[in-house]
Amino acid sequence: MPQHPRFRGEDFVWYEERCTGCASCAKFCPLGIIRIVTRPSGVMTKEGEKNALEVFDIDLARCMFCGLCVEACPYDALHMGSGFERARYTRKDLVINIDELRRAPKRPSTWFRPQLEAKGYNPHTDRPLEWHEVGRHEAPDLEAMQARWVEVR
């Protein structure tokens, strides 16, 4: 069955390389379905210290797929996925844990990332994307920045 690239599926795409363990996604979830437990890792990132994640659970049994967790993530580590076949017999099996998030196919929905759609990316037919390909904003090149400064002055 054909699906639109902006379809918000019942799975999540998580890029561990981008995640700092700040728990913004958990804080902004209106239903409180995201559980994160961290410990200091000592790894320095551009913005500050990165935490090591011990627990990262998403309870799909209660998720309403609003996407506020995706919008709240300042590092673009969490995205809505494009899968839709997560039927289970028990509610506890609907909890996605950190290992499942690591193994999940990296095919983010273009719902919150229209720049992916503008590039013609289709999560259902194209290859999985690496963490550096799904940023919220494209980094401008030097010429574009210089031209902007000239126009502003």
Model-derived regions, located:
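Short, charged low-complexity linear segments at domain edges
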Residues: M1-D11, I33-A52
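A generic structural signal for short, non-catalytic loop/turn and secondary-structure boundary residues
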Residues: P5-F7, C29, A87-Y89
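Cysteine-centered iron-sulfur cluster-binding motifs in ferredoxin-type domains/subunits
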Residues: F12-G32, D57-D76
